[in-house]
Amino acid sequence: AYRDASSSPVPVMMAFEGVGPTSFYPEDWKCYGFDQNAEAAAEMFSVMTGKEVTAEMFGTAEYDELVKDASALLWVNEDTVPTVMAYGQHDKFQPYEGSVRLDKALTENGVPHEYIVLPHSGHGLQNDNRLYAEYMAKVEEYLNKYMSE
Protein backbone atom coordinates (compact mmCIF):
# COMPACT_ATOMS: atom_id res chain seq x y z
CA ALA A 1 0.00 0.00 0.00
CA TYR A 2 2.79 2.46 0.80
CA ARG A 3 4.57 1.95 -2.51
CA ASP A 4 1.54 2.06 -4.79
CA ALA A 5 -0.91 4.33 -2.97
CA SER A 6 -0.36 7.33 -5.24
CA SER A 7 -0.60 5.37 -8.49
CA SER A 8 -3.22 2.76 -7.62
CA PRO A 9 -6.30 2.70 -9.88
CA VAL A 10 -8.32 2.17 -6.69
CA PRO A 11 -7.86 4.87 -4.03
CA VAL A 12 -5.79 3.66 -1.08
CA MET A 13 -7.26 5.40 1.95
CA MET A 14 -5.60 3.44 4.77
CA ALA A 15 -3.67 0.26 5.46
CA PHE A 16 -3.84 -2.41 8.10
CA GLU A 17 -1.46 -5.27 8.58
CA GLY A 18 -0.28 -7.80 11.07
CA VAL A 19 3.38 -8.87 11.05
CA GLY A 20 4.01 -7.51 7.54
CA PRO A 21 7.49 -6.96 6.09
CA THR A 22 9.06 -3.77 7.38
CA SER A 23 12.77 -3.48 6.70
CA PHE A 24 15.77 -5.40 5.48
CA TYR A 25 18.53 -4.09 7.72
CA PRO A 26 20.70 -6.85 9.24
CA GLU A 27 20.55 -5.29 12.70
CA ASP A 28 16.77 -5.78 12.69
CA TRP A 29 17.18 -9.52 12.06
CA LYS A 30 19.10 -10.45 15.23
CA CYS A 31 17.00 -13.57 15.71
CA TYR A 32 18.71 -14.98 12.60
CA GLY A 33 22.15 -13.73 13.65
CA PHE A 34 22.25 -11.38 10.66
CA ASP A 35 23.52 -8.55 12.85
CA GLN A 36 26.67 -10.67 13.29
CA ASN A 37 26.91 -12.29 9.84
CA ALA A 38 26.56 -9.89 6.91
CA GLU A 39 27.21 -12.63 4.34
CA ALA A 40 24.29 -14.70 5.63
CA ALA A 41 22.09 -11.59 5.68
CA ALA A 42 23.03 -10.82 2.08
CA GLU A 43 22.15 -14.37 0.99
CA MET A 44 18.77 -14.33 2.73
CA PHE A 45 17.85 -10.83 1.55
CA SER A 46 18.81 -11.83 -2.01
CA VAL A 47 16.30 -14.67 -1.84
CA MET A 48 13.63 -12.49 -0.24
CA THR A 49 13.95 -9.60 -2.71
CA GLY A 50 14.86 -11.57 -5.83
CA LYS A 51 17.85 -9.27 -6.33
CA GLU A 52 21.55 -9.83 -5.79
CA VAL A 53 22.58 -8.38 -2.44
CA THR A 54 26.16 -8.38 -1.20
CA ALA A 55 27.41 -7.73 2.32
CA GLU A 56 29.32 -4.69 1.07
CA MET A 57 26.06 -3.00 0.07
CA PHE A 58 24.68 -2.73 3.61
CA GLY A 59 24.46 0.85 4.83
CA THR A 60 24.53 2.39 1.35
CA ALA A 61 21.95 4.29 -0.70
CA GLU A 62 22.46 1.63 -3.39
CA TYR A 63 21.28 -1.04 -0.95
CA ASP A 64 18.21 0.95 0.10
CA GLU A 65 17.24 1.42 -3.54
CA LEU A 66 17.78 -2.29 -4.26
CA VAL A 67 15.47 -3.49 -1.47
CA LYS A 68 12.99 -0.61 -1.59
CA ASP A 69 10.26 -2.55 -3.42
CA ALA A 70 10.09 -5.06 -0.54
CA SER A 71 10.61 -2.66 2.37
CA ALA A 72 7.61 -0.73 3.70
CA LEU A 73 9.92 1.44 5.77
CA LEU A 74 11.61 2.96 2.72
CA TRP A 75 8.29 4.23 1.32
CA VAL A 76 7.17 6.13 4.42
CA ASN A 77 6.75 9.88 3.95
CA GLU A 78 4.30 12.59 4.97
CA ASP A 79 1.81 11.28 2.36
CA THR A 80 1.75 7.70 3.68
CA VAL A 81 -1.78 6.48 4.33
CA PRO A 82 -3.04 6.03 7.90
CA THR A 83 -2.05 2.62 9.21
CA VAL A 84 -2.99 0.08 11.87
CA MET A 85 -0.30 -2.51 12.53
CA ALA A 86 0.34 -5.29 15.01
CA TYR A 87 3.55 -7.18 15.73
CA GLY A 88 4.49 -10.01 18.06
CA GLN A 89 7.52 -9.26 20.17
CA HIS A 90 8.71 -12.87 19.81
CA ASP A 91 8.24 -13.11 16.05
CA LYS A 92 11.06 -15.09 14.44
CA PHE A 93 9.66 -14.91 10.91
CA GLN A 94 9.25 -11.12 10.54
CA PRO A 95 11.52 -9.83 13.29
CA TYR A 96 9.92 -7.41 15.73
CA GLU A 97 12.85 -4.95 15.62
CA GLY A 98 11.91 -3.83 12.12
CA SER A 99 8.44 -2.86 13.32
CA VAL A 100 9.98 -0.50 15.88
CA ARG A 101 11.81 1.24 13.04
CA LEU A 102 8.58 1.45 10.99
CA ASP A 103 6.65 2.91 13.93
CA LYS A 104 9.36 5.55 14.37
CA ALA A 105 9.25 6.51 10.68
CA LEU A 106 5.46 6.83 10.72
CA THR A 107 5.64 8.98 13.86
CA GLU A 108 8.41 11.20 12.47
CA ASN A 109 6.41 11.77 9.28
CA GLY A 110 3.21 12.63 11.16
CA VAL A 111 1.29 9.67 9.73
CA PRO A 112 -1.82 8.74 11.75
CA HIS A 113 -1.21 5.20 12.91
CA GLU A 114 -1.76 2.64 15.62
CA TYR A 115 1.14 0.39 16.57
CA ILE A 116 0.08 -2.54 18.72
CA VAL A 117 2.80 -4.72 20.20
CA LEU A 118 1.83 -8.16 21.44
CA PRO A 119 4.52 -8.89 24.05
CA HIS A 120 3.87 -12.62 24.44
CA SER A 121 3.22 -13.50 20.80
CA GLY A 122 5.18 -14.61 17.79
CA HIS A 123 4.26 -14.42 14.12
CA GLY A 124 0.77 -15.78 14.73
CA LEU A 125 -0.15 -13.03 17.23
CA GLN A 126 -1.56 -15.92 19.25
CA ASN A 127 -0.75 -15.27 22.92
CA ASP A 128 -2.23 -11.85 23.66
CA ASN A 129 -5.99 -12.14 23.21
CA ARG A 130 -6.85 -8.75 24.71
CA LEU A 131 -4.31 -6.92 22.53
CA TYR A 132 -5.35 -8.86 19.44
CA ALA A 133 -8.94 -7.81 20.08
CA GLU A 134 -7.69 -4.22 20.46
CA TYR A 135 -5.92 -4.52 17.10
CA MET A 136 -9.10 -5.76 15.42
CA ALA A 137 -11.12 -2.94 17.02
CA LYS A 138 -8.60 -0.38 15.73
CA VAL A 139 -8.82 -1.88 12.24
CA GLU A 140 -12.60 -1.48 12.37
CA GLU A 141 -12.24 2.08 13.71
CA TYR A 142 -9.86 3.04 10.89
CA LEU A 143 -12.05 1.38 8.26
CA ASN A 144 -15.04 3.37 9.49
CA LYS A 145 -13.06 6.60 9.67
CA TYR A 146 -11.06 6.46 6.44
CA MET A 147 -13.16 4.29 4.15
CA SER A 148 -16.45 6.10 4.68
CA GLU A 149 -15.16 9.44 3.39
Residue ranges and their predicted role:
Residues W29-W75:
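Mobile cap/lid helix-loop segments that gate and shape the active-site cleft of serine hydrolases
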Residues S121-Y132:
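Catalytic histidine-centered segment of alpha/beta-hydrolase-like enzymes
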Residues T107-H123:
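Catalytic histidine neighborhood in serine/cysteine hydrolases
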Residues A1-Y32:
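Primarily recognizes the serine-hydrolase "nucleophile elbow" in alpha/beta-hydrolase
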Residues D79, M85-Y87, D91:
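Short beta-strand/loop motif that positions the catalytic acidic residue
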Residues K92-V100:
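Conserved alpha/beta-hydrolase "acid-adjacent" motif
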Residues P21, Q89-K92, H120-G122:
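Acidic beta-to-alpha connecting loop that harbors the catalytic carboxylate
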Residues L131-E149:
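Catalytic active-site module of serine/aspartate enzymes centered on a nucleophile-bearing elbow/loop
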